[in-house]
Amino acid sequence: MQITFLGTSSGVPTRSRNVSSVALRLPQRAEIWLFDCGEGTQHQLLRSELKSSQLRRIFITHMHGDHIFGLMGLLASCGLAGNTERIDIYGPAGLEEYLQACRRYSQTHFSYPIQVHTVQPGEVFSDQDYSVVCAPLKHRVPAFGYRIQECDRPGRFDTDKAISMGIPAGPLYGRLKRGERITLPDGRTFFGQDFCGPKEIGRKIAYCTDTIYCPEAVELSRDADVVIHESTFSHQEAELAYQRLHSTSTMAAQVAQAAGAKKLFLTHFSPRYAPNSATGLQELLTEASAIFPHTELAYDFLNYQVPRRTLTTA
């Protein structure tokens, strides 16, 4: 699981930061999932090492332009590039109507299937490898945060040990990998736990934007390996944050701390914190780190490989 930040500015792009978008790369299944798609996201994809041909799912938090204005252009370009794979899009009410209007007035026709899912609190996607749940956040328009949960996996299977015990290869290996008990024709019994390394605990990622501090963000971030949380304002601008229902750096840190998360990335920075401004982003990092030390500032094209868990590190 690799996270790539494609846009880390709020409201409008700056010279060094595009508006909101985060990509999650799942190399074991050759897929990319996108979270928000602000204007210019397809340009950011082209500048990154990611392949838009692997795009399979897009999760939209809310209907503000800095989170959706790049969506139609990206989908149209995928079609022009010859994409044939279905893309599933998840988001709040109004998203499907927005895309339908864009298609109708621009006379855009897709050569591949698109499925739009209007989300409700709870699970929005699951398969044998991952699940995604959403919860309402506290913003000026309906907004949802997302939690990506990787399913637990058995530890590495010791094939050499199984061979040395005279266990024939085939379906019995699969049963042992799943932790089951098997009995051979000669009466010997073996337990899967004796042939597998430490269990790999599924990794968790929380994506919370746009929102002020709220209990739902804490629950989405509970025990997360990575929390990606908006930090539009510094603590000095807390009154403005309450007025506009955005988070300060300290609010984001309080979410991560209350949730028992392992790492926090701040993103969605107001352009007022541009280089050479009176208050810089380093100040936001200092504020957050005083509460939650494992905090980093996200920047465009930052890649982060989410480390695997085992029973000893969970």
Swiss-Prot record:
Cofactor detail note: Binds 2 Zn(2+) ions.
Cofactor(s) required, per the database record: Zn(2+)
One MF term in the entry's GO annotations: 3'-tRNA processing endoribonuclease activity
Enzyme class: hydrolase
Domain of life, per lineage: Bacteria
SUPFAM superfamilies from the UniProt entry: Metallo-hydrolase/oxidoreductase
Annotated binding of Zn(2+) 1, by residue: H62, H64, H139, D210
Known role: Zinc phosphodiesterase, which displays some tRNA 3'-processing endonuclease activity. Probably involved in tRNA maturation, by removing a 3'-trailer from precursor tRNA.
Protein name: Ribonuclease Z
